[in-house]
């Protein structure tokens, strides 16, 4: 009965993602001028809707053990996309080159905060998936980060990383680490692989 319930839930989750995609496609096919002319056909105008669909598909792939690794880039660094839901209408790339002005820094902060605010949706989704005696979030290691620490200067030193999930007990959580200056980000990636038993 437990396996049947799990399979039913998985299939219903797939059907729900399909229904949401169909609703989005119907809205986008209205002939209206799209907010994002460079967006590929079928991608929702709403950033949050797009990210949630991508997270749902990733969670489904994990639940079905189709993959154990994925990479997802939430946006292009050179994009002029705007995120009005963030509280600013400044495009992403121009906001990243804020010139150190108080307004510019605030706009870029609002956009980044908006992006990070998408993560709890994915975490909750993974936490809702039963995985053995625990849940998918407890069995997962998620790395979220930025390729720059100061995009205004194109500075690649001391780039921020957030680790989420428990990696099957390998991540303790509630820890803030500051690596010594000059430490390559590759060291963090290597430590993560070692914690998963990869040499």
Name each model-derived stretch.
Residues 1-199:
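Ligand-binding pockets and gating/stacking loops
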